[in-house]
Structures are given as structure tokens and as C-alpha cells.
């Protein structure tokens, strides 16, 4: 089902340009497609590739007779570098943008620590939200294009000392793809320190973030007269807290060279005001709050990555190994966001539900002289796939002898 997309995006060429290694029996594109197949099929670990030892259809997906054994997939992760991942992400995101987010202006950023359950001696401690405390983990960083909700960047090769520079590394990555920096960036208080906000300013990029609530700040706001707070309504559908009060002012931050706009908001379900910081002076306070609320999309996407793409099933304590897994998560997320965009009425459906309703199905594959014919068995959602015409304008599949794929439905 995803072969037409991968061929249209030039996946094989992106793999070649990135310089991924291969073996005498398994070329680089087949190795990566084997790893990607596990993400697309809700498999938790590389060792679970042995579930498909005799599945010829999945072997065909990767351009092989059958998928490689778990020893190969495990070993392959240790042969890649960060440069390989960056090269593949550059090609993938640039090609996918033409289909899903051609006019991208807004990106949400977030860190995600993947907990490690073995010997912690080689790993740094990071705060783990699910445990409510710090623990040994591998820190990963993701970026999400706001409108399409498509992951567009990942890095798992980060140390604590390098953490605050990751935003600028992403900005340079984005500029290399689009010849411009993002117009808006949304991120929480842990992504960068205040000195890094100066560099964001220099890019000409607007940011919205939140400020940590110090006791002195909370006390000062508590002394402000009620007449200095303005009422507003955040009428987002299904939003729980819609009636808010805010105070809009400019403040100074340590290590930040200019005055910054601070919007203090009450009524969001917390005992103390939430402090929004932005360098934009034209948007209303209400619009700033709504913009930052949209950052939940990157958290939702990371939740799906944990739930369906099994991001938290740590591939290794070696960061470079985890980096390849994070890159495969970005690719799998893009595949499912594309699939949802093609299915009318299912644009917002999660990858897990898309998989259950449309991908997890049986059928037959017939390799003909001029094409590869895929017959889907009868299912209630087949009319939706038929209407989407995923195989329209057939594209030759380079790793399948340049044969196009045709879908038929019982």
C-alpha cells in the first residue's frame, strides 16, 4: 500500500545519496525497507522480524525474496552514523513536503526521553514524565510540521551538554531544505535556555514558549489588581477551559538581550498563572494562547509514536542505534499521514486505527510481466481504498525491476 508513495518520493535515491551501507546479499534500500516494514506493521522490536520469516509479500516490499533475519537487522543499526540519518531525512522531508506541507510555516518542537531498563552506567539521567522522576534514558528530539501533523526531524544522538543547541541545528536543517527559516516555532521551557532565544530572534523567526513559574513571579502577579486582567474566551471546539483572564506585559529575562512579551494567563486549570513568552508584538494575547495550544500536536504525535511505532522500546543503549530507530519513526509517521490524507474522511485518524482498518488485511500478490498486481480480500473499508485510488498515475518501483503496482479489490 505504501510502495507507490515510496517510489514517488524517490526513496531509493535518497538512501543512495545518504550513503547507507549494504551487504553482498542485501542492498541498502532493502535493509532500510525491512526496518521500515516493522514500524509500519506495529512490531515492537527488530527481533520480531522473525515473525515474517516466510512472508514472501513482505520480502517483495523490500525487494527481496524474504525479509532478513533478526541478526542482520540488529547488526545493521550499528553500521550507520548520524550523517546517514541526516542525509535520509533531508531527502525524505523535502520530497514529502511537496505532497503534505508545501507551504509549511509553523513547527512544534519537543524532547522525548526514552527510558532504559538495563545497566544505567553509560547513560545520562533525564526527567521521565511517566515515572515522575529522572532516570537513565536516551534523549531524543522531534520536530512536527503543524498543519499536516507530520514529523519532519529527529535526532537521538544528543547529550545533555548539547541539548540547548538542538533548536538551532533544526533551524539550519530546515533552512537547507526550504531556503528559509520557520516563520513560527512552538516549544516548552526545557527546549532552550534564554540565551538561545537571542539566536532565534536573529533568524527572524517568531517563537511561543512558556516560562517557568518562579515564586517571586507568582507573588508579583498575585498583587496585581483584578482590573489589570483582561477576560477572553478560547472557543476551540471540545476545549475544557475556555474562559480565561490574561495580563499582557513586557519583561526582562536573564541572558536575553531585549524586552520580551509575557502573557500571564489564569483559567487554564492550574492554581498559578501560565506564563507565555513570545517575540511577536502584533498577535493578540488570545491568538498567542491558541497558537501555543497547538503545540499539543507534537505531544500527540509522540504519543502515537510510543503507542504504535514503539519508540519507547529502546533499541540499544548506544545513541547512534536509537538514532536510526527514531529516523524510521519519522518515515513511518510520514507514510501514515500520507495515507490518512488520501482517505476521504480519515485525515485525522491515528496511525494505529489506520493500520487496523486499512493496512492489516489479507490478499494476494501476482507478479506479472508488466506490473505487480495486489488483490485485497473483501473488507468493509475497501470502498474507501478504491475511492482513494492510491495507485493512480503508477510509478515504476526501482527496487522491483521498475514494475508499477496495481491494486484491485474483491
Protein language model regions, located:
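Domain-level cores of phosphate- or acyl-group-handling catalytic modules
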Residues: 161-216
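Short, conserved catalytic/metal-binding motifs centered on acidic residues
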Residues: 34-35, 49, 69, 73, ...
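Basic, amphipathic alpha-helical segments enriched in Lys/Arg and hydrophobic/aromatic residues
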Residues: 312-371
Amino acid at each position: 500500500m505504501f510502495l507507490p508513495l515510496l517510489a514517488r518520493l524517490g526513496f531509493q535515491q535518497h538512501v543512495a545519496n545518504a550513503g547507507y551501507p549494504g551487504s553482498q546479499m542485501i542492498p541498502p534500500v532493502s535493509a532500510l525497507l525491512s526496518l521500515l516494514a516493522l514500524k509500519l506493521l506495529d512490531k515492537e522490536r527488530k527481533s520480531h522480524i522473525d515473525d515474517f520469516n516466510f512472508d514472501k509479500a513482505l520480502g517483495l516490499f523490500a525487494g527481496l525474496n524474504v525479509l532478513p533475519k533478526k541478526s542482520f537487522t540488529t547488526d545493521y543499526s550499528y553500521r550507520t552514523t548520524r550523517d546517514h540519518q541526516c542525509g535520509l531525512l533531508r531527502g525524505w522531508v523535502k520530497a514529502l513536503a511537496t505532497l503534505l506541507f508545501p507551504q509549511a510555516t509553523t513547527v512544534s518542537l519537543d524532547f522525548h526521553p526514552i527510558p532504559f531498563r538495563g545497566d544505567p552506567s553509560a547513560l545520562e539521567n533525564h526527567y521521565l514524565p511517566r515515572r515522575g522522576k529522572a532516570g537513565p534514558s536516551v534523549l531524543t528530539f522531534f520536530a512536527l510540521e503543524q498543519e499536516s501533523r507530520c514529523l519532519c526531524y529527529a535526532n537521538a544522538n544528543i547529550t545533555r551538554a548539547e541539548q540547548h543547541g538542538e533548536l538551532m541545528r533544526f533551524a539550519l536543517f530546515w533552512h537547507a531544505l526550504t531556503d528559509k527559516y520557520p516563520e513560527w516555532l512552538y516549544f516548552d521551557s526545557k527546549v532552550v535556555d534564554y540565551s538561545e532565544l537571542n539566536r532565534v530572534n536573529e533568524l527572524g523567526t517568531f517563537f511561543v514558549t512558556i516560562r517557568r513559574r518562579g515564586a517571586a513571579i507568582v507573588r508579583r502577579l498575585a498583587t496585581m489588581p483584578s482590573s489589570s486582567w483582561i477576560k477572553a474566551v478560547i472557543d476551540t471546539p471540545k476545549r475544557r477551559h475556555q474562559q480565561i483572564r490574561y495580563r499582557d506585559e513586557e519583561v526582562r529575562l536573564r541572558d536575553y538581550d531585549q524586552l520580551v512579551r509575557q502573557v500571564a494567563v489564569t483559567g487554564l486549570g492550574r492554581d498559578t498563572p501560565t506564563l507565555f513568552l513570545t517575540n511577536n508584538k502584533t498577535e493578540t494575547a488570545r491568538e498567542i494562547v491558541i497558537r501555543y495550544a497547538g503545540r499539543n500536536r507534537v505531544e500527540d504525535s509522540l504519543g502515537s509514536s510510543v503507542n504504535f511505532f514503539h519508540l519507547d522500546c529502546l533499541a540499544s543503549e548506544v545513541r547512534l542505534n536509537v538514532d536510526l530507530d527514531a529516523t524510521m519513526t519519522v518515515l513511518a509517521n510520514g507514510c501514515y499521514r500520507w495515507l490518512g490524507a488520501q482517505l476521504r474522511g480519515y485525515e485525522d485518524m491515528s496511525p494505529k486505527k489506520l493500520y487496523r482498518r486499512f493496512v492489516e488485511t489479507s490478499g494476494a500478490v501476482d507478479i506479472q510481466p508488466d506490473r505487480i498486481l495486489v488483490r485485497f480480500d473483501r473488507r468493509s473499508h475497501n470502498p474507501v481504498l478504491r475511492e482513494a485510488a492510491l495507485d493512480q498515475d503508477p510509478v515504476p518501483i526501482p527496487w522491483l525491476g521498475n514494475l508499477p503496482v496495481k491494486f484491485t479489490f474483491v
